[in-house]
């Protein structure tokens, strides 16, 4: 996740707005890389306990309260426990790939944070630098690529385990990432068309005084896609406990399992930071009169963390309130709703952007159109009680009954009124708990109609 000076010099040469990164000495780049790494680890430890406490509150439970003040060190205790547990490798596993898969899953989560701006220019040990590890002329594309690399770790873990359930979980994960990566990419396209730049620092600077929350459909599209991207409820199909035991990490234990756990929560922090950067102004304060002065020095870092925590609460809120979707519903929603809406919205943003550039400022029209498309998207999501799906099931059942041959069926267990017909039921003996096994009477040969 570190950036070399040559990379920064190349980026500065490609884009004059990035010249500040080329002036950073190597020790400062290394210091910022270590700070980003430590920030992600601390946010992961916090998010684990925060989630357990919030879900416990929603379920009227106490939650963790043993380790540390009010239980806030519970995640440290869990990490120590996982590191001390026995590390088991299945006999049928492909050992090199089995060991490498958790690392492949965790590393891309750190990489994406390299281009996230935490704050404006500050002074660190006398050196003026931006609170951002690095920036590129194509930072948004870098974010999209880094976010999609983690799926390789999930696929390798399922394939190398030598077990059926992990393999099914990894296949689900691949299909899920492919489906929702397209919708996420369409949300990104609308943002950088509207902003006119692919640089994350340029996008944040363009939101001074107004956030890109006006791109309502892109924001809704991204919020749904980021939940699917991180395999969180209600889109946690690759690790569905009731169907696949533990999913792709069923055969993992000890520190390898901890790596998957770490990757999941760092991905949550990363996609939350991307949403903050692209739609909520990044480190910029809210566009409220009186707060415009709180956008210099180290104060913007607080705004950034607060927005990050709001998105983490959004993840936890979804987990505590929504059930898991069925696999066919999940894939149908991605391909039939999200992607078409994203394509229409990108076309609308591009049209208005060209019209705005060559005619006059039509931002109010763009905002109004965004609100309309956002309302249509929300209406498309609403299916009270699954009524449409229930109708489809009933119609399918009626078709089956209509196509089935008309035969007399013997109900099981037999109804009480049929007890006197034919031979009486015979008891085959009592079981260990005192119950008896009943052999039904022979109804005799069936007569064809």
UniProtKB/Swiss-Prot annotation:
Annotated membrane topology: Multi-pass membrane protein
InterPro entries referenced in this protein's UniProt entry, alphabetically: NADH_UbQ_OxRdtase_su1/FPO, NADH_UbQ_OxRdtase_su1_CS
Region named Disordered: 393-449
The keyword Iron-sulfur appears for this protein: no
Primary role: NDH-1 shuttles electrons from NADH, via FMN and iron-sulfur (Fe-S) centers, to quinones in the respiratory chain. The immediate electron acceptor for the enzyme in this species is believed to be ubiquinone. Couples the redox reaction to proton translocation (for every two electrons transferred, four hydrogen ions are translocated across the cytoplasmic membrane), and thus conserves the redox energy in a proton gradient. This subunit may bind ubiquinone.
Family: Belongs to the complex I subunit 1 family.
Protein name: NADH-quinone oxidoreductase subunit H
Organism: Frankia casuarinae (strain DSM 45818 / CECT 9043 / HFP020203 / CcI3)
Lineage of the species this protein comes from: Bacteria, Bacillati, Actinomycetota, Actinomycetes, Frankiales
């Amino acid at each position: 996740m570190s950036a070399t000076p040559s990379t920064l010099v190349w980026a500065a040469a490609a884009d004059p707005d990035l010249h500040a990164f080329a002036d950073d000495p190597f020790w400062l780049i290394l210091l910022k890389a270590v700070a980003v790494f430590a920030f992600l680890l601390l946010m992961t430890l916090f998010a684990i306990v925060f989630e357990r406490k919030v879900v416990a509150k929603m379920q009227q439970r106490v939650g963790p309260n043993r380790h540390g003040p009010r239980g806030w060190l519970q995640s440290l205790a869990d990490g120590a426990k996982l590191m001390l547990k026995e590390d088991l490798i299945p006999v049928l596993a492909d050992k090199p790939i089995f060991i490498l898969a958790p690392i492949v899953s965790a590393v891309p989560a750190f990489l994406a944070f390299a281009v996230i701006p935490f704050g404006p220019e500050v002074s660190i040990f006398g050196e003026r630098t931006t609170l951002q590890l690095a920036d590129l002329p194509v930072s948004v594309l870098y974010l999209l690529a880094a976010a999609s690399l983690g799926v390789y770790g999930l696929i390798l873990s399922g394939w190398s385990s030598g077990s059926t359930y992990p393999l099914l979980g990894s296949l689900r994960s691949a299909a899920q990432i492919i489906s929702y990566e397209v919708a996420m990419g369409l949300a990104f396209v609308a943002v950088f068309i509207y902003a006119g730049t692919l640089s994350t620092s340029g996008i944040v600077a363009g939101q001074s005084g107004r956030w890109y929350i006006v791109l309502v459909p892109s924001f809704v599209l991204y919020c749904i896609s980021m939940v699917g991207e991180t395999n969180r409820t209600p889109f946690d199909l690759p690790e569905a406990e009731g169907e696949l035991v533990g999913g792709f990490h069923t055969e993992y234990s000890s520190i390898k399992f901890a790596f998957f756990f770490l990757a999941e929560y760092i991905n949550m922090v990363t996609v939350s930071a991307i949403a903050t950067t692209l739609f909520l102004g990044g480190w910029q304060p809210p566009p409220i009169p009186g707060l415009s002065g709180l956008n210099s020095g180290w104060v913007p870092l607080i705004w950034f963390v607060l927005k990050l925590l709001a998105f983490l609460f959004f993840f936890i809120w979804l987990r505590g309130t929504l059930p898991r979707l069925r696999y066919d519903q999940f894939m149908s929603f991605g391909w039939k709703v999200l992607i078409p809406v994203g394509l229409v919205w990108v076309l609308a943003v591009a049209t208005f952007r060209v019209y705005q550039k060559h005619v006059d400022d039509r931002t109010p029209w763009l905002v109004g159109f965004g609100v309309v498309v956002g309302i249509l998207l929300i209406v498309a999501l609403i299916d009270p009680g699954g009524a449409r799906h229930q109708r489809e099931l009933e119609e399918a059942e009626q078709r089956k009954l209509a196509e089935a041959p008309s035969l007399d069926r013997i109900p099981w267990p037999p109804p009480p009124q049929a007890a006197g017909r034919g031979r009486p039921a015979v008891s085959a003996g009592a079981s260990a708990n005192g119950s008896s096994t009943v052999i039904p009477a022979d109804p005799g040969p069936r007569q064809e109609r």
